[in-house]
């Protein structure tokens, strides 16, 4: 009985992280989509826009990595 509960608990953790990864995935898509559109509208500001794009990407991916690490830290 306890083996079955452990298997279900592990599966729920994977599903939870999969759902949590949707947010950063959507965020990265929005960042690069809007950044590309902004560079097309103002090519002279491409360097500044690209720098802000990369910074936003790093913050979004940090959220995904935190979501991946937290179950290991708390022992779920």
UniProtKB/Swiss-Prot annotation:
Membrane-spanning residues: 12-32, 54-74
Subcellular location: Cell membrane
GO function term, MF aspect, one: lipid binding
Family in the record: Belongs to the ATPase C chain family.
Reversibly protonated during proton transport, annotated site positions: 61
Oligomer status and interactors: F-type ATPases have 2 components, F(1) - the catalytic core - and F(0) - the membrane proton channel. F(1) has five subunits: alpha(3), beta(3), gamma(1), delta(1), epsilon(1). F(0) has three main subunits: a(1), b(2) and c(10-14). The alpha and beta chains form an alternating ring which encloses part of the gamma chain. F(1) is attached to F(0) by a central stalk formed by the gamma and epsilon chains, while a peripheral stalk is formed by the delta and b chains.
Keyword Transport included in the entry's annotation: yes
UniProt-listed Pfam families: ATP-synt_C
Membrane-topology descriptor: Multi-pass membrane protein
Keyword Transmembrane helix attached: yes
Domain of life according to the entry: Bacteria
UniProtKB keywords: ATP synthesis, Cell membrane, CF(0), Hydrogen ion transport, Ion transport, Lipid-binding, Membrane, Transmembrane, Transmembrane helix, Transport
Listed name of the protein: ATP synthase subunit c
A single GO BP: proton motive force-driven ATP synthesis
Purpose of the protein: F(1)F(0) ATP synthase produces ATP from ADP in the presence of a proton or sodium gradient. F-type ATPases consist of two structural domains, F(1) containing the extramembraneous catalytic core and F(0) containing the membrane proton channel, linked together by a central stalk and a peripheral stalk. During catalysis, ATP synthesis in the catalytic domain of F(1) is coupled via a rotary mechanism of the central stalk subunits to proton translocation. Key component of the F(0) channel; it plays a direct role in translocation across the membrane. A homomeric c-ring of between 10-14 subunits forms the central stalk rotor element with the F(1) delta and epsilon subunits.
Gene3D superfamilies in the cross-refs: F1F0 ATP synthase subunit C
């Amino acid at each position: 009985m306890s083996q079955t509960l452990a298997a279900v608990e592990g599966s729920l953790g994977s599903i939870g992280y999969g759902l949590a990864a949707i947010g950063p995935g959507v965020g990265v898509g929005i960042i690069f989509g809007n950044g590309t559109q902004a560079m097309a509208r103002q090519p002279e500001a491409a360097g500044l826009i690209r720098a802000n794009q990369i910074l936003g990407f790093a913050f979004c991916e940090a959220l995904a990595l935190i979501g991946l690490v937290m179950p290991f830290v708390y022992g779920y």
